[in-house]
């Protein structure tokens, strides 16, 4: 993983799986999302000001899983508690959402997929972006991966037509 080009995936869920395995929490999912749930269950509390990001810089818009896991392994080998590593991982993901949004001039962020059922991650997103961003989550459509395609269709239609569609009423701001 740390030699060659790193883990290549477009699914954050697979990165949750890899971290869970690295931390000896779950090597094989017996159901979809098990590793992510077990990671989340390890977090009993956190203070956002005490969190540290494993990734500070995005190079050419690419998020380096190699750098992510190199920094996680550094903390693991130094004896940092598992719970702190997991908390910093969630914090890293939350910070990345806003880093990408800022680089692209986006203030309205729609979050979908199984990863955004993680209560700790969602709490961090609200804490970090509460005043500067509008966060949207599924209310009537399933938040699981099967509805990521809905967002992809909206992006495609907006780019193809060079105009923005109104967000349907059923997808309302969740605060």
Residue ranges: model-predicted function:
Residues 17, 24-26, 116-117, 140-143, ...:
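Short, glycine-/Ser/Thr-/acidic-enriched flexible segments
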């Amino acid at each position: 993983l740390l030699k060659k080009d790193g883990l290549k995936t477009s699914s954050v869920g697979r990165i949750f799986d890899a971290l869970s395995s690295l931390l000896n929490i779950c090597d094989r999912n017996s159901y979809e999302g098990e590793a992510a749930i077990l990671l989340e269950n390890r977090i009993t509390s956190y203070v956002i000001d005490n969190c540290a990001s494993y990734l500070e810089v995005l190079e050419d818009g690419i998020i380096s899983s190699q750098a992510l896991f190199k920094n996680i392994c550094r903390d693991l080998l130094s004896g940092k508690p598992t719970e702190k590593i997991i908390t910093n991982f969630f914090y890293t993901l939350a910070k990345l959402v806003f880093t990408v949004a800022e680089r692209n001039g986006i203030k309205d962020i729609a979050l979908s997929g199984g990863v955004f059922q993680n209560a700790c991650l969602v709490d961090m997103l609200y804490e970090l972006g509460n005043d500067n961003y509008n966060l949207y989550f599924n209310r009537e459509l399933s938040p699981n991966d099967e509805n990521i395609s809905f967002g992809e269709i909206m992006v495609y239609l907006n780019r193809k037509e060079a105009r923005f569609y109104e967000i349907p009423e059923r997808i309302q701001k969740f605060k």
